[in-house]
Amino acid sequence: MTALLAFLAAAEPATQGIDPWIAFFSLITVVITVGMGFWTAGKSKSAGDFFVAGRSVSVGWNASAISGEYLSAASFMGVAGMVMLNGYDALWYPVCYACGYLFLLLFIAGPLRRFGAYTIPDFAEGRYDSPLFRKIAVCFVLFIGFFYTMPQMKGAGTTLAYIFPGLHYSVGVIVVGAVITLNVALGGMKGITLVQAFQYWLKVFAITVPIFVIAAVVGHYQSHLEANKTAQETVAAAPAGIERKALPAKAPKDEQWIAPFGSLTTKAVDTAIKAAKTPEEKAALEANKKPYSLLYTYSLIIALVCGTAGLPHILVRFYTNPDGVAAKRTTMWVMILIGVFYVFPPIYGVIGRSLTPELYDAVGSKGTDKVVLELPTLLAGRDHPLLGSILSGITCAGAFAAFMSTFSGLLVSMSSALAHDIYGRMLKPDSSPEQRLKAFKWAAVIIGVVSVGLGTQVEKLNINYLVGQAFAIAAASYFPLLFMSVWWRGMTMRGAATGMLVGGLLALGSIFLTTLSDVYGFTTLADFWVAHPLLRILCEQPAIWAVPLSITLMIVVSKMTAATI
């Protein structure tokens, strides 16, 4: 390792500004992805190929493809950024992302595949013999899908702005959105299966290799963890007033009392408040305190675990397995594959706390979400400029793979809902397979344009924050529907529809209101949230009440309408 570093230290990157290695690796990733899309386009002929890849995907390929689709920009970039920003409190993200597949394995994957539908709305209509329920299910496919495309677009804009300094965030969103939309319109589900399987292994390579090399140069994980702990203890022991006066400008905006490392636990906020000597200091600290943080954490856990089992673009992939047994085996392997991946992003977050505190003072595409992209560049300041450029190129390639694979899956899921469930089943039931394929391609283009438009509006928000909201909507709508429909014979159509509509729409509405104030800063709405912090938390992350409400309504209404079974 020492000899290799000494050799690479002798070389300098060819240019300043746009790093050629970063541009090269990113371009190669895009070219391979689009090339695979064109190659498989010739093999995707039937409706079954476009919607469920002919139901012929093997366990290994499908597990890799599902993992590639699931490990989104939130996993590759967002987890590290949240750990850097919030410390231990953010570890629930990777843990719950992986645990959600246990619910899928135990309760949903096998029965869902044995049902033999093309889409989740297919399942909804088939289970309850209700075309109306299909329409409701399609609406929630779109609601969840559009909310989930926004963090992918945020990742795309952040990465492109990093690769091309000075490039506007929106330009990156538009360019990446156009490329992915073209890829999906060409190949459908069969086309993206190969792409997503390849992208999973690319992401694993891109998240693991750089962190091992970085640790060899800047110090191992434990040393940086100890540095974080020391800073935390120093701040907690010092009078808050003194600490605030000496505070660097690099501290996170929402926790100004802490050192450049950010907060490790919310308990430290209380410690600093108690140390405040004047009412003014105490009031300032109270204003920066995140209220009801434990309640938010519990709600987040419910959203991520249950939401994973309710994501339409993930669930539809189980229809590509040959049978229910293969679907269960696929789920087991997915848990292993994503579990291995999630070991590494928190390490980036911890090291980032020590080495890139300047990210705390930035917002949007320049904030902590880009710590994975930023850490390799530190090697340039340690006499390894070429090595830093190469590793930066690898991490950028992984970021491209992350948001491209997930956005592809979302586009297929939403386009299938429009082409198969709306056009093929409602608007024109006698349409030919060729007409449905054409409808799929047009739907992909329309949804791609809308997704890009939404993505340009969320630059200020954290990637994982957006993902948590999408998961909450899925947890309050699709998870209760699937779980109760599979395991309770007494469920009626009216019960399922009532629970899904009330729980899902209330979660959607509350999330929409908080996001609206975060993005556009409406004064009246912002003042209302300040005056009602508990209500703000319950609306920002509604899973803790929306999921039980949805299930309760399903049970009560089904009991009241048992005669309709």
Write out the residue ranges for each language-model feature.
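Membrane-embedded helix-loop-helix hairpins and adjacent transmembrane boundary segments
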Residues: T2-I565
